[in-house]
Design a protein with these regions (language model features):
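A short, N-terminal "cap"/entry segment at the start of jelly-roll beta-barrel domains
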Residues: 20-86, 181-188
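Short, conserved beta-strand element in jelly-roll/cupin
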Residues: 86-101, 105, 114-129
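Hydrophobic h-region of N-terminal signal peptides that target proteins for export
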Residues: 10-19
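Conserved metal-binding segment of the jelly-roll/cupin
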Residues: 139-161
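A short hydrophobic beta-strand segment most commonly corresponding to one strand
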Residues: 162-180
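Short alpha-helix capping/helix-loop boundary micro-motifs
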Residues: 132-136
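Bacterial N-terminal signal peptides that target proteins for export
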Residues: 1-8
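His/acidic/aromatic-lined binding-pocket segments of jelly-roll/cupin-type domains
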Residues: 82-83, 89-93, 138-139, 146-147
Length: 188
């Protein structure tokens, strides 16, 4: 099993026991697969932007989504864009490239993302975006690193020389993401 698949399996397995509230539905009786080939298919797609949701699975009491994200180079000294997600935790597993991930702290000019946008409807639910004034934490990240970002915590990348690409596993206790979603390139 390659490193990407092993990392994804480990993160999903750990999160499958995540605490939840609200609904009390029965979890699925079968596992959901996302193969290394699936990840590469979505990564290599010519369209789809920097945040590409692969699947959203209804786990009963909560949803879990898995996406792959890519951030391009940042300009030294440029303002750092900050985003938070009101309901969804994100677990990043870096698969290639590197950069500095900023989290928490203070943000200027925060505004809600459009409710009808794909990022809100499919990827992360209600979210806000602004510019970092002062981050609470900074850390260099590269292949193999995992970072867990709670709901409401602003985050963004800087010091990206070429790119940073990562898998994001998103526990969704409020069912704001569309259960059953499958990236169009992965529908069989």
């Amino acid at each position: 099993m390659n490193r990407i698949t092993l990392g994804i399996v480990g993160v999903v397995a750990a999160l499958s026991q995540a605490g939840t509230h609200a609904q009390n539905k029965v979890p699925p009786q079968l596992a959901t697969d996302i193969t290394a080939a699936d990840v590469q298919t979505v990564i290599k797609a010519p369209t789809g932007g920097g945040d590409r949701q692969m699947k959203v699975v209804d786990m009963g009491k909560y949803n879990v989504s898995v996406g792959v994200l890519r951030r391009g180079p940042t300009k030294p000294g440029a303002p750092v864009s900050a985003i938070n997600h009101e309901h969804v935790t994100e677990v990043y597993y870096v698969i290639s490239g590197s950069g500095t991930l900023l989290t928490g702290g203070t943000v200027d000019g925060a505004k809600p993302l459009p409710a009808d946008g794909e990022i809100v409807k499919i990827a992360v639910g209600p979210s806000n975006q602004g510019v970092f004034k002062q981050a609470a934490q900074t850390r260099k990240v590269g292949p193999g690193d995992i970072v867990i970002i709670p709901p409401g915590v602003y985050h963004g990348f800087t010091d990206v020389a070429d790119h940073v690409e990562y898998v994001s596993v998103r526990p969704d206790p409020d069912h704001v993401l569309p259960a059953g979603y499958v990236h169009p390139l992965l529908k069989k």
